[in-house]
Amino acid sequence: MRQRTPFARPGLLASAALALVLGPLAVAAQEQAAPPKDPAAALEDHKTKTDNRYEPSLDNLAQQDVAALGAPEGIPALSDAQYNEANKIYFERCAGCHGVLRKGATGKALTPDLTRDLGFDYLQSFITYGSPAGMPNWGTSGELTAEQVDLMANYLLLDPAAPPEFGMKEMRESWQVHVAPEDRPTQQENDWDLENLFSVTLRDAGQIALIDGTTYEIKSVLDTGYAVHISRMSASGRYLFVIGRDGKVNMIDLWMKEPATVAEIKIGSEARSIETSKMEGWEDKYAIAGAYWPPQYVIMDGETLEPMKIQSTRGMIYDEQEYHPEPRVAAILASHYRPEFIVNVKETGKILLVDYTDLKNLKTTEIEAERFLHDGGLDGSHRYFITAANARNKLVVIDTKEGKLVAIEDTGGQTPHPGRGANFVHPTFGPVWATSHMGDDSVALIGTDPEGHPDNAWKILDSFPALGGGSLFIKTHPNSQYLYVDATLNPEAEISGSVAVFDTKAMTGDGSDPEFKTLPIAEWAGIAEGQPRVVQGEFNKDGTEVWFSVWNGKDQESALVVVDDKTLELKHVIKDERLVTPTGKFNVYNTMTDTY
């Protein structure tokens, strides 16, 4: 196993022409952009510092119109219309990594004290060209116009505005039950193969598509919140829950002749996570959703989405014991061993085990883990929760049966971003769980079998390179011998349009890097316009096919590409004018059973 180092920034280039030859990197334009201070010093200052104190200087959200704040001397002011346009772009494209308050997490902090030192030209170049460490090349990819890039560089120099709270009153006002439980079917009324159905996020359309995993037919397109982040299944497999980044939750009854939303609610202004109770005897009883803003989670009735319990996550950072005003709720999973929800609180570095047996006397186990917790998943036994503290480059392991911290391990890479991770049996190490990274090209394996392979348990056993930095998801299946790794956010079109495939049976564990095969997914899709990015492999129920989204601009052609897992050859391309910005895909059976 080789030690991996993060992507180093190349030296300054003399001209924009040379920058275009060598690739669309933000640093390529630094000298031409003439930042107001030495770039190396500027970058050092731009890093998130562990001793930052958090001031409650709050920000606004995409849907709300606000008056532009006054600009300090020397910084151009924005009109109200310009400020609202920039605000909308920020919360649609940037807040997920940089935070509602711009305090940073997966991405660097973008508070005015930092951005004003960097200066307009530096910000303009970085937004335009991106970096291999996971910052998209918004300008050169065409996703933002030159005018929008300039607008965003100016916007980041200004103080943020304050967003409103969102409590029980607002939730209940948004809550709607379209079909009461007693009026719903008592058995499945359609002939769909629900277990092999895919829920596909149509990000910028504010919709999901339900697609038959056998025939590839788009069975239905349903309106949802904006930019659905995830789809989750009830334990019974009947109800599909989706949550948009705008905090809207839709509960869809798949038993209806034409599946439709039977209940909905808005749980905040910015959100990412939803889950349902899975413990035996508690199946489908509750749903839980977590918000980025306000920082809180809400437990809801599992049949109606009626909000029952709201808990704020504001509080003290676990290690510094300093107050944080924006500890966002990231991944939420349901325990298979206890009637508990597992809740990641990003900025404070705490994992909450929330006992849902008695909401009036709520019991919560608070585990000190590591800051900047993001996503993660269960090991193959479903007992251990493995999650990434991505800005700290760590993996945290929780024993969900015993309810305690097991291990914290450095991955050796930069900014792990596993999605739910990938479980497989390594020929040498035994059962492992894998993560890829946003900030470099590495894949890390951690041992997950404390009984059968105790010497390997909870240790980083191997690290090896894939296609490049900017990976968002890694995927395999119990019936597959292959491990698929995307590089969605890489600024190089050839890399972001491909995936790396590793043969897990050929891995040796002798310190040599396993070879991978590159699948040109975007090329197979036959899309000639834009910079289509390939994102998130998702298997069908049987593990014989893996689907990839070919994600393009809202007004450009996108597609879904289906790969034969045995031959690694193209099997099918799904194209339809309704497939607008497809991103996440969730197979009903695999999602319901936590198979990954």
Curated annotation (Swiss-Prot):
Residues 30-76 are annotated as: N-terminal tail. Keywords: Electron transport, Heme, Iron, Metal-binding, Oxidoreductase, Periplasm, Signal, Transport. It is an enzyme of class 1 (oxidoreductase). Its EC number is 1.7.2.1, 1.7.99.1. Residues 1-29 form the signal peptide. It catalyses: nitric oxide + Fe(III)-[cytochrome c] + H2O = Fe(II)-[cytochrome c] + nitrite + 2 H(+); A + NH4(+) + H2O = hydroxylamine + AH2 + H(+). Residues 163-596 are annotated as: D1-heme domain. It is found in: Periplasm. Its cofactor is heme c; heme. InterPro entries: Cyt_c-like_dom, Cyt_c-like_dom_sf, Cyt_cd1_C_sf, Haem_d1_sf, Host-pathogen_enzymatic-act. One of its GO terms (molecular function) is heme binding. Homodimer. Inactivation of this cytochrome oxidase results in the loss of nitrite and nitric oxide reductase activities, but not of nitrous oxide reductase activity. This is Nitrite reductase. It comes from Paracoccus denitrificans (strain Pd 1222). The gene is nirS.
